[in-house]
């Protein structure tokens, strides 16, 4: 969801003819080898000071994410969403606990109606140094509390 339209289209076309039935991808963009581009949209709008405002979701981003999840679902491919990761240059890995809670409650309430969703709390959670063990427990509690459909949940 954080690549250009051509690569996203190619990926979806490739998946359509592949044997895969689950794909993992991140809600937040990654800054990593082969992921150096600037995403077209981010999950949140910015406030007047240029900081992420988790109270103001960027609906273009969320609508696009839902569109991709729907396309995957039509191909009988489940979406394993990675909710946090350490490969960040935009500041999402360093959101305050109350910001993480706002983000998670919005995400789970919005996406849990999709039957083919898996929640991966993090990719390499042990490298997310900004979060304490207690914060990970709280993240798990929030997801379980908000997900009335009880989708699969993992820490990796």
Model-derived segments and their meaning:
Residues 1-156:
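Active-site mouth of glycoside hydrolases
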